[in-house]
Curated annotation (Swiss-Prot):
Function: NDH-1 shuttles electrons from NADH, via FMN and iron-sulfur (Fe-S) centers, to quinones in the respiratory chain. The immediate electron acceptor for the enzyme in this species is believed to be ubiquinone. Couples the redox reaction to proton translocation (for every two electrons transferred, four hydrogen ions are translocated across the cytoplasmic membrane), and thus conserves the redox energy in a proton gradient. This subunit may bind ubiquinone.
GO biological process, one term: aerobic respiration
UniProt protein name: NADH-quinone oxidoreductase subunit H
EC number(s) stated in the UniProt entry for this protein: 7.1.1.-
Source organism per UniProt: Desulfotalea psychrophila (strain LSv54 / DSM 12343)
Amino acid sequence: MSLTLINVLAAALIALAFVAVNAAYLVWAERRGAAFIQRRLGPVENGPWGLLQPPVDGIKLMTKQLVIPGGVDKILFMVAPVLAMFPALMSFVTIPFSENIVAHNMDIGLLVILAFASFAGLAILLAGWSSRNKYSMMAAIRAVSQTIAYEIPMLITAITVVLVSGSVDFIEIVHSQSGGFWHWNLWPLKPGLFNIFMPISFLIFFICSLAETNRAPFDLGEAESELVAGFHTEYSSMGFGLFFMGEYANIVIGACLTTLLFLGGWDCPFGLFPGVWWFLIKIYILIFTFIWIRWTFPRTTIYGLLNLSWKILIPLSLINLLLTAGFIKVFAP
């Protein structure tokens, strides 16, 4: 076995551990945050402040029987949860947490992650189709149409950032934002490049990240009041657990991408923390924002969801891309 393959496998195991811990304790954080917003206590029974609740829930999921309903396509039914989790693990392998902390740096890291993101729709479609359940199938169709609709403006916005930074390598993108928070791609008047449209790019990318992770108010694929539990209605035990971990892993990936593309990555404007800690602070602030939005805004309708993308975000992102290219041509040094 080659050294490169060993390194990739080790990186995948580290990514799996990182995803598992984050998925477990982001559930705890979300439950505590929801309780605070709704003036409840949240989980408090297992350990201080309920901190042992995630491992207890994990043990419960792993010890439950995996029930395969009659009439399902067994092969696709078993493959779908793995396919939902695998792209998230591979994405973490290419994400740099600082200039020196990256499992496997790639010159095309942004393209790789955006390519892996497209697998999410396939996993959802396989889960709905193989379940032979009308609610699961309807939820899968909703979720896939949502994924396709919001991948387009996300990709266009990512191209806008590539134009500004001149690279698809995450480390180069972060380097183009170094020198203080006023150099981040978030700001409209970045020194040396008068790009007044970057706040629009950030807003579009953030909205698309919410929609791509099926988070409220865009959780139409799991609308409990309409579709039981959505595309994973028939799943139990670790089949459900893999979908659950994949969802929270995608939340972390969305926060990482937003931080790398718009918030300077591990660049620290004050020099108070090492780069990796500053990077983690940024992504967890974004994750808290995801949680806050979920428990603040009501679920939209499927028509409103698709109209927002096809009629507003896609045209706006295209106009933004063209104007950004024009400004770079005119004003770039």
